[in-house]
Amino acid sequence: MSVRKNSPASPKPTSRSRESSRSPSVTDLKDHSKAKRTLCRNILLYGSCKHSENGCAFRHDGPFIPSSENLEQYSVKKKLNAASASFQPVRALPVKAAGAAVFVPKSQEKSLFLSRERTPVALSPGSHAINPYNNASMLVNEPFHDDSGVYYTRQNQFKPTLYNLYNPQPSPMPTLLPYERTVNGLFIDDTTRERIERKSEASRQTISALPSIISSYTSLAPLNTKLYRYKEQIGFSSWTYKCTSSIDGNAYVLKRLQDCSINIDTSTVDKLKNVFHPNIVPFHSAFHTDTFHDSSLLLIYDFYPCTTTLGELYLNNSKNSVKLEENRKIPERELWNYFFQLTIALSYLHKSGFACNKLTPSRILVDQTERIRISGCADYELVVSNKPPLEERKKQDFVDLGVVIANLATGRTDMDMSSAARAIYSTYSREFYKAVLYFVSEVPEDKNLELFLQNHIESFFPIMSSPYVECEKMERKISDAFQHGRFFNILCKIMFIIDNNRASREYPIAREKEISLIYLLRDYLFHQIDEDECPVIDLYQVLNRLGKLDAGINQAIALISRDELDCVSVSYGELKAWLDNVYEMEINS
C-alpha cells in the first residue's frame, strides 16, 4: 500500500529509500547494514548532508570540517549550551580569595578543527630566530675542500673577498685612430711619474733620533740596510746617511768613519772633486766632527735615491734580490752592459791619476734603468796613508773587475776562479768567457782597457746605442708635458682677473670691454655645449686652445656669451695681447 506524499506519519520518500510493496529480503538487509557503516559522500564534499534527517541511509556522525562562520559556535558549544543548568554558587567567596594568585593553566585546549581562511599574523623575531648576517662563516662561499681543516672544527671567521680573483680581467685597450688621443697620453706616463715620485719621497725622509744638524747638513736618515756596524776594508767602522744641504737644498750622502782622526790632504780632496764621470759617484767634501761624541770623519757624496747595490740585487737573498734560484742566471746582454760601464769608469779613474781600490759588488750602485755607479772612490785615497804604488793598484783593479763579473755570472762569491771559469764556459758564449778570463787570469801581461774595448767592440755596440734610444724616449715624454707649465701660467692669469673683478667696481669703458672678453674666453674654454645642450668635457680641446693662445696665432674664433646675445670674432693673438694687458693692469692697481 502506498503512502500519501504529505503524510506526517511516514518519512519523505527519497531516491535512495523508496517504499516497496514486497518485504525486505536478506540481501537488502545486508546492503542497508553496509550503508550504515559508510560515511556519507556529502559530508566529505560539502561538510553536511541536507538529507541526514530525511532518510539518508549513510552514516553522518563522522568528523567534518565546519565553515568559518560555524567554527566559533562549535568551539564554545559546550561552554554556552542553552540546555545546560544555570550556574549556582554554593556560597560567597571568602575575603582572602581576593588576594589569591592568578590562575595559570598548565596547558591550553587546542581546537579540534582548523579554519580554511588564512589570517595574517605579525611575526616577532624570537630568541631562536636565525640572523643570516650574524654568522660570518655563512657569508664566505668556499666550494672547494679545505685540507688544512680536516681534523679541526671550522672557526667562525670572516675573510674579505679577494676582488682581484673574482673580478674579470679588463678588456684590452682598443686601437686608436691616428687623430685620437687618451688623457694619459697628454701627460707623463705612470711608470716614469711613479719612479720620479719615489725618488722625491726618498730624498725627504728624516729620522728624529739622529742629530738635527751637522755643519751645514740637516735632515739625516740612515741608508745602511744592515742594523749592525760593519768595518770597511779601510779599517774603520762606517755608517751611511742621507742628508740635505742648507746651502743649496740638495740631498747628499754623508759617510761617517768612526774614530778616524787622520789628517786630510787638501790637495787630494781638490783633485777628487774634479773626478766627474757618469758611472762614478761624485765626491764633494771631507771634514771632521764631534757631533757623534767622537772624532768622526765625514765624507760627502752625491745622493741617488731608489738605488741598490749589485751585491744586494743579485748575490744576497734579501727582499730586493732577484736572483734567489740556483739555476737562474743573469742574461748575457745585461752582463755585457755592466762590463762595459765598469770598464769605461775604471779607464777614466786611471787616466785621472787614481785607482778604484778594492772594487766589490757592494760598492757598485744600480738603478732601475741598469745604470751603475761606483761609490766610495775617495775613501781609500783619503784615509789610507801607506798605499801601494798606483800601478800596482791599477793592476789589482783589473783582477777585481773580472772577479765581480764572475760573481754575477755564477751568482756566488765563495767560488774559486777556476770553478767559476768552468761554469761560465758552460753557460755563456765563448767571447764572454774570454773577456772574463782576460781579467782573472794570472798571466803576467800588461792589461790595457782600451785594447780590451777594441777587441770586444762588437759586443759593446748594442750597449752604446741603448742610451740614445732611452734619451729619445724621455725627450718625447718631456715634449708632451713641457708646455703644461705655460698653460698653468695662462690659467692663473685668467682666474686672477675674473676673481678680482667680481665685485662691482667702476672701470673705464675700454677696460670693461677687455674684461668682458676674458669672461667670454673663460666660457669658450670651459663652457662648451653641443647641439643637445649637453656640456662638452674635452681635455684635449682645452689644451689645444691654450696652446694656440700661448702661441698667439692669427686664427679667428667666435666668442659667444652664455645667453647667446653677444658674439665677438677675435683672433688668438689679440686675446693674448688683451690678457697680458689686463693682467699687467691688475698688478699695477
Curated annotation (Swiss-Prot):
Keyword set, alphabetical order: ATP-binding, Coiled coil, Cytoplasm, Metal-binding, mRNA processing, Nucleotide-binding, Nucleus, Zinc, Zinc-finger
Coiled coil: 458-496
Recorded superkingdom: Eukaryota
GO BP annotations listed: mRNA processing; nuclear-transcribed mRNA poly(A) tail shortening
Binding site residues for ATP: K255, D302, F303, Y304, P305, C306, T307, T308, T309
Region called Disordered, residue ranges: 1-32
Chain intervals for the UniProt region annotation (Knob domain): 497-589
Annotated spans, Pseudokinase domain: 201-457
Its job: Regulatory subunit of the poly(A)-nuclease (PAN) deadenylation complex, one of two cytoplasmic mRNA deadenylases involved in mRNA turnover. PAN specifically shortens poly(A) tails of RNA and the activity is stimulated by poly(A)-binding protein pab1. PAN deadenylation is followed by rapid degradation of the shortened mRNA tails by the CCR4-NOT complex. Deadenylated mRNAs are then degraded by two alternative mechanisms, namely exosome-mediated 3'-5' exonucleolytic degradation, or deadenylation-dependent mRNA decaping and subsequent 5'-3' exonucleolytic degradation by xrn1.
Sequence similarity: Belongs to the protein kinase superfamily. PAN3 family.
Listed HAMAP family: PAN3
Domain note: The N-terminal zinc finger binds to poly(A) RNA.
Name by which UniProt lists this protein: PAN2-PAN3 deadenylation complex subunit pan3
Species, as recorded: Schizosaccharomyces pombe (strain 972 / ATCC 24843) (Fission yeast)
